[in-house]
Amino acid sequence: SGLTGLREHLRRRRATAWARPRQWASKRRDRTLLPDWPLPSPQETGPRHDVTVGVIADEFTALALGYEWRSVPLTPTGWREQVEQTPIDLLFVESAWHGNDDAWRFQVIGSQGPSGHLRDMVTALRDRGVPTVFWNKEDPAHYDESIETARLFDWVFTTDEAMVEHYRRDLGHDRIGILPFAAQPAIHNPIRLLDEAGRPAPLRDVAFAGTYFAHKYPERREQMEIVLAGAHDASARLPHGLDIFSRYLGGDDTYQFPPPWDSHVRGSLTYTQMLSAYRAYAVFLNVSSVVDSPSMLPRRVIE
């Protein structure tokens, strides 16, 4: 309703004081320069659909879909009690490496996938008549690591249209579909960040957020060199220039930005800070490790 929307607007307005420009101008590798975007509570807003879903997903998918349905984040050892306490209408499993806050670490795809816990759960729920869905967002790069997991499910969806025929061939059925990445309007929207006076904060110039791969994805690396070189060269003529947020800052050397990009690295961001970053820049740069898919692209592009 109008009053509900106004209350939500005022709540966000109070919660989103923007960092001072002089703080932004510093080159501290401090991720707190961006505020956490306040998340509306799915419990307060209510799900858009009257469906209860058992879920294994990463934090981004779990958050986005939590506004669409009632989510039950299942665990490897507690799922039986969970579905007895809260009967589910659907099982939705994403190709998550660290599903449900690491409860399913490498058990869906990866070194342990599909694990015995996952096999037992999917089989038991199918026997109960619960429809089961597997969504592979890691296609095409990790198709071979996911196909055995896909065999367990009633329905399989992929982010890459080019892989549909591969699934039909290897699984022997037609219950295959395309489920691309999507934005969640509750959190991915043009509501502006505010300065301390409550006015829309001035936009910074250009940002890139993600990972540098020194050891793989050469075409992606070539894309990065093109777009980052342009932003680097333009930075001298811009008030703020290029800001880079590195996903693996300070970790393995193969994931660190080399010169001259490293001089633009401003730190790492949590996901709620990333939601603020989306709103903070006039331009957000993106590249993709998938270069020949008709449908696959980074989730961040759509968000």
Q: Model features per residue range: what roles?
A:
Residues 1-24:
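Intrinsically disordered, low-structural-confidence terminal and linker regions
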Residues 16-84, 95-98, 103-104, 110-113, ...:
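Nucleotide-sugar donor-binding catalytic core of glycosyltransferases
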Residues 46-48, 125-134:
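Short beta-strand/loop segments at the ligand-binding rim of alpha/beta enzyme cores
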Residues 85-86, 151:
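Active-site charged/polar residues at nucleotide-handling catalytic sites that mediate phosphoryl
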Residues 89-90, 131, 155, 283:
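Structural motif
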Residues 116-128:
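Catalytic-core regions built around general acid/base machinery
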Residues 133-147, 184-187:
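Nucleotide-sugar donor phosphate/pyrophosphate-binding loop at the beta->alpha transition
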